[in-house]
Amino acid sequence: MNRLQVELPGLSLKNPIIPASGCFGFGREYAQFYDLSVLGSIMIKATTEQPRYGNPTPRVAETPGGMLNAIGLQNPGLDKVMNSELPWLEQFDLPIIANVAGSQAEDYVAVAKEISKAPNVHALELNISCPNVKTGGIAFGTNPEIAADLTKRVKEVSEVPVYVKLSPNVANIVEIAKAIENAGADGLTMINTLLGMRLDLKTAKPILANRTGGLSGPAIKPVAIRMVHEVSQAVNIPIIGMGGIETAEDVIEFFYAGASAVAVGTANFIDPFVCPTIIEELPALLDELGFDHISECQGRSWKQTCHSR
């Protein structure tokens, strides 16, 4: 029995560990360190219809317990992803999750329609929560009606299940999650980064050229856990949880909150081996906690019954 195997819409994962979009590129750099086939999946870099060069520099700043980024969805564009990046990834035994972004609803629809045809793309991650672009991005993820409409339009053209990435920069994340579920989403991924800022002590000006950026890393984990805990009790579609995950213990905490799989982001910048290390350590942790299978941990913090030994 594979104690870590997870079945989600469109995704048969050998384990629930997935590098998060934006922190792993298209996997080329990390393939120098280990066989990417050990992973559950990869959420590839956000793809837009046309190439994007991103925001001006500086666009990364360290913070206590994390980092701020304002990359601005830099990517080579749909054609390059379809003709180069995705074919390269076919050498690995991996179902790919393609992150889809855009400035207008029509952009999302166009990218989703084409990229979902790729043979190794098994699901889409609809990026309606990037805080670092002036148009699109978070604008779609902070209004329930707009988020639902975009979800419905993408579902109509996608050939694979659609997961929607939620923003934490909202007053009521449950309301948005339920609207997206009602629009036909197959799953949710959460959370994206929290909007933040750092100021230079000598100039009193923002360190980032974009002024603000998305906060990620261990500092946001308690927020992510709280939001997964709330949303998982309100919807009937699976959640891929993310936000500050660095260890096997972090993974179990997200499962307890209600996640069915997890994505590891900023930690990849600190330790390129973090994902395989977590995968290796999870079975021993399950033994220690008295579980036969990782699915037994899902929603344990709020479910009335559990199946621990």
UniProtKB/Swiss-Prot annotation:
Note on cofactor: Binds 1 FMN per subunit.
GO cellular component, one term: cytoplasm
Record has Cytoplasm as a keyword: yes
Subcellular location as annotated: Cytoplasm
Listed CDD domains: DHOD_1B_like
GO terms under biological process: 'de novo' pyrimidine nucleobase biosynthetic process; 'de novo' UMP biosynthetic process
Protein EC: 1.3.1.14
Pathway(s) this gene product operates in, as recorded in its UniProt entry: Pyrimidine metabolism; UMP biosynthesis via de novo pathway; orotate from (S)-dihydroorotate (NAD(+) route): step 1/1
Cofactor(s) the record lists: FMN
Residues annotated for FMN binding in this entry: 21, 45-46, 99, 127, 165, 191, 217, 243-244, 265-266
GO molecular function: dihydroorotate dehydrogenase (NAD+) activity; dihydroorotate dehydrogenase activity
Main subcellular location: cytoplasm
Broad enzyme group: oxidoreductase
Family, as annotated: Belongs to the dihydroorotate dehydrogenase family. Type 1 subfamily.
Quaternary organization: Heterotetramer of 2 PyrK and 2 PyrD type B subunits.
Biological role: Catalyzes the conversion of dihydroorotate to orotate with NAD(+) as electron acceptor.
Protein name in the entry: Dihydroorotate dehydrogenase B (NAD(+)), catalytic subunit
Species this protein is from: Bacillus cereus (strain ATCC 14579 / DSM 31 / CCUG 7414 / JCM 2152 / NBRC 15305 / NCIMB 9373 / NCTC 2599 / NRRL B-3711)
